[in-house]
Amino acid sequence: MPVTVFAGPDALRLALRLQSPGDYVVASNWNGPGSVVIEPDVAHRTRQCPCCAIRLDLVDGLLRAARRARRPRRILLVADPSDDLTTMTYTLLSDADLARHVRLDGVVMAVDAVAAATRIAAPGLLGNELELDALAVADAIVLGRSGELTTDGFGRLVSALRDVNQVGHVCAPALSARGDDRPDDDVVMGLDAWHGAPTVSTAGPSVSRRDRDDVPDTVVLRQAAPLDPDAIDEWLTWLVDTHARRLLRMQGALAVVSASARVCCHGVRSFAMSHSEAADPVTSRRDDSLVIVVGHGLDVDELSSGFAATRAR
């Protein structure tokens, strides 16, 4: 069952606008029809280890929704502004009970275009640290009230969003033919964005935000030749082990010499998982590899050289 996570100050409003019959909304600040109420309850798989924090209430709430007598069509999970989205995605991906019932479909960031444009004109950041972390990993960024911006103001806002996010697409429904703030369902849901080859909006090798510690880095790594299986496995283990506390998202599609199809991998914090791309719609053999790493304090040169060394000799 697909789970779409909504984040941002306007997340609940957007989720409720998109809710259709058969959808369940799981949130801490909504108790309406077709909803499951949760209250943040964080535990640690290893005592006091922040890289393995898990939301117990999220596990319980999603399982309650998924096990309803009338099975939901999909689940719309709304993050409270004070929630750590990384803990939520870690819980969704790493909990074995959840994995049997639900699948992370994508992260949608709801942004008030007027408020965001005002902040960057100040000048300032697009949000606080939690909001920036969510923005950096979002698969869709929905701009509310985008029709109230000037053409120049809209362009500056999209450019600022692209400085932080390199994995998602920007949606401005108010500028569409319909002209309201409700995006089409297929723009923000049904993405299955965390389990296959990553989508990257930049053509460059990497994007770095070294100038500010509170703005996440995004590093994009590419190889045009097959990889050595032992070398890439060792590199991925090193990546997760050394970056777990600051790893917001890792995702890749790897052409390994010993595999008939590319190997897809994804992870967050201390969790990582892989599967064959043959399980996804695209099954043809490709020799190109792509990995995105989103986190804080990433060393672009270290990541690039380590990944380059995994090339098969």
Enumerate the language-model features and the residues they cover.
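An anion-binding loop in the catalytic cleft
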Residues: 281-299, 305
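Residue-level signature of catalytic and energy-coupling elements of molecular machines
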Residues: 58, 107, 232, 293
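Short hydrophobic/aromatic beta-strand immediately N-terminal to the Walker A/P-loop
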Residues: 3-7, 76
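A short, charged/proline- and glycine-enriched loop
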Residues: 1-3, 214, 287-289
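C-terminal accessory "lid"/substrate-recognition subdomains
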Residues: 130-279, 298-300, 310-313
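Non-catalytic terminal/linker segments enriched in charged/polar, low-complexity residues
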Residues: 4, 16-20, 310
